[in-house]
């Protein structure tokens, strides 16, 4: 219903409306539409494509290092099951926290698969001979910083604290470790070119109040059914919720369908979700996720989706696996 209604509406919506405001392009897990996600190679390719920010998701290792992986699990993006079959937990998963950095270095990072071993995006990277490996946050920061220096560029960091409550239960304060790392690179001030993001509202509050982080924070918004954290996202997706978020965060990262009023959509109308105006009024940056050229809603084009995001939704940017089509749209439409 969402995709069919959205298609009909988008076809009748004028997509080219010039605006002076910037539209941030965030490289989701690096150039993950072209190379295995979160590898240094994916970050390098993303840099070459010149987004505004490159994302790093962060999890902890057994020996206290921070590595860049989207999940606390390893089995869907590496060959860990073949190399360490006896390190599986009772739930059938392999966890980064159970491995030292040296052990993680022996793994080959591959294109993402589901838990049955089927590649999630069938037409993405098929190679097996190039050796992609797990990298640390320090390595990602150094790489992007050096490329910025050499090319006189200013691409920012967009770093996510993954599963802080789970890490805490395992005895790891991942947020403090992240802030310690950022401080070493002077990425902890209010003017630093970085967003720290998290799905856990309690941890966002802790970052600001208890840990004293002065930089920009984004609260990611999930659907309650996903079990992403103990946060009640439905309560936050209201005018009052946006006001509460604005007390601690500088921005929000909603799931794309959350941007539209579903009741209006069922009537064939495109109406921004009621909380969206409040978020803008509160000064929250709005960076929804995730635009994928190879996972568009049925029957819709990239131009239609991006047109909705830039006008009439008028969000501040988007997370994307593929930077070039977003840049091309912005160039052609004068955004």
Set out the residue ranges of the language-model regions.
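Gram-negative bacterial Sec-dependent N-terminal signal peptides
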Residues: 1-21
């Amino acid at each position: 219903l969402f995709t069919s209604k959205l298609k009909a509406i988008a076809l009748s919506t004028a997509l080219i409306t010039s605006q002076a405001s910037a539209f941030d392009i965030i490289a989701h897990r690096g150039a993950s539409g072209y190379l295995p996600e979160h590898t240094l190679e994916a970050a390098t390719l993303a840099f070459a494509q010149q987004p505004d920010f490159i994302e790093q998701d962060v999890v902890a290792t057994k020996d206290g290092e921070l590595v860049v992986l989207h999940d606390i699990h390893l089995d869907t993006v590496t060959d860990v099951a073949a190399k360490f079959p006896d390190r599986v937990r009772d739930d059938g998963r392999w966890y980064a926290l159970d491995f030292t950095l040296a052990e993680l270095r022996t793994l080959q990072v591959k294109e993402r698969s589901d838990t049955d071993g089927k590649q999630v995006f069938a037409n993405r990277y098929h190679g097996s001979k190039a050796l992609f490996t797990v990298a640390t946050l320090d390595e990602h920061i150094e790489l992007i910083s050096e490329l910025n220096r050499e090319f006189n560029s200013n691409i920012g960091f967009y770093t996510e604290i993954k599963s802080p409550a789970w890490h805490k239960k395992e005895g790891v304060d991942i947020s403090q470790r992240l802030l310690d790392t950022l401080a070493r690179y002077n990425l902890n001030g209010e003017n630093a070119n970085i967003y720290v993001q998290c799905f856990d509202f309690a941890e966002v509050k802790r970052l600001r109040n208890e840990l004293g982080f002065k930089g920009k924070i984004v609260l990611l918004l999930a659907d309650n059914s996903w079990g992403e954290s103990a946060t009640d996202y439905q309560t936050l997706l209201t005018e009052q919720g946006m006001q509460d978020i604005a007390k601690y965060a500088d921005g929000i990262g909603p799931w794309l369908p959350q941007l539209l009023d579903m009741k209006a959509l069922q009537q064939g109308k495109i109406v921004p979700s009621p909380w969206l105006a409040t978020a803008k009024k509160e000064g929250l940056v709005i960076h929804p996720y995730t635009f994928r050229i190879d996972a568009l809603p049925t029957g819709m084009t990239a131009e239609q989706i991006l047109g909705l995001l830039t006008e009439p939704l008028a969000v501040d940017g988007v997370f994307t696996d593929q930077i070039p089509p977003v840049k091309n749209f912005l160039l052609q439409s004068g955004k």
